[in-house]
């Protein structure tokens, strides 16, 4: 295993500069064009070299399942432009709306935009910075259009600590994938508490493929490969992180990695949502470890998709010092965020970590940011265009550190000094408080639902709470923003919508009673409909009649 420095460091030698510049004259433009073409060719050649060079892999960590072998696919889409609308091309030779994206980099201009080459909401919060939420319009007079299954409910039994409980519906985070298939079908994909991944026609709610069974419940959100490979990535409480093919007669497991591939110290669930950047999958597990895995996606001689994964980096998310402070509950339940060439994750011990992944293909990912927020972080780190971090923290342990910092925190991971920018308190008194939901970035305001029943709007510059709405207690679902409309699900089974024309004073538009049970899952907004599951055992499509 590559050596990883666990020491604390906030300093990055060079911060990316973002500034304007005067337009050159015509001759300068011609010279610039030539330079750009030459540099572009060099970048493409370099990208191909990187993808063809064998990575450094740990000697003592191997994937537990036998993967499918294949010729490697061409270099993924590092030099292509990211799609931003139906009209924009994904080809760097025809698109004039977005700059080229270097391989293994998530540029600042991808914040708030869709990710990848297919049309769809392919992962939790839509992109690697976790800042894109779907496509409008948002319904204006919503009704339940259909629910799934037609009868009964999606329920399963799961055992934790010797206690067996029946779980129904979809849970936290539980956001569905919605995507436009090449055959014209809009498909919704989600994992559920009946120990299955389900595939539905977004128009009718009827199954599009057989459900994929797992050995235990699925709490987290699934990921559809963003580069067009017919692969779905998901974890389960059955200890497995999987890659599932979607180009066979039925969804088929291509590869699985067991959580005990390392010596974890909490449990073996996979709640976090995998993120894929140029053939590298990043994921954290409840075994308390972070992984960077090269997928080696390709196709066999019959044209069927294959993977041949290899672990590039495996890093414990904890330190001995952290365990001495908070105990052994240091699992990574949140999803990984990626910005430029940094990967961020947070764990249940309150540790927020940033890794430099510029040499991840060589098996290197040194820690460049390390900060303790004092309590459990299950919500996902959100990164804005300037690389600032928004961290939503629970209030369970009642530590002095958490009381000092607050429960919604903004951090500057690039500063040489104290990275703490501001914090908003949300204590729970004698009970739990704080946030399980992941923040949604708006226009100068960040929005979030709290366990204590508050829907907040917070100024991103000052940390001032500029707006607050009372909602149901235990609201863990993450709010979403589409077409200047904020949509929030509550634990009272409601969907609420607010007009963000004035982001500091949202105007209530409607409240829809979707279910009589708690909605813990995060909704997906897609072309006039809202898709989300409930703890009542059902999954819903909501829209205008």
What are these regions (language model features)?
Residues 3, 11-13, 33-34, 55-56, ...:
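Detector for intrinsically disordered, low-structure N-terminal pre-sequences
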Residues 1-28:
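Terminal targeting segments of Actinobacterial cell-envelope proteins
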Residues 95-116, 124, 131-172, 177-271, ...:
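Extracytoplasmic/lumenal domain signature
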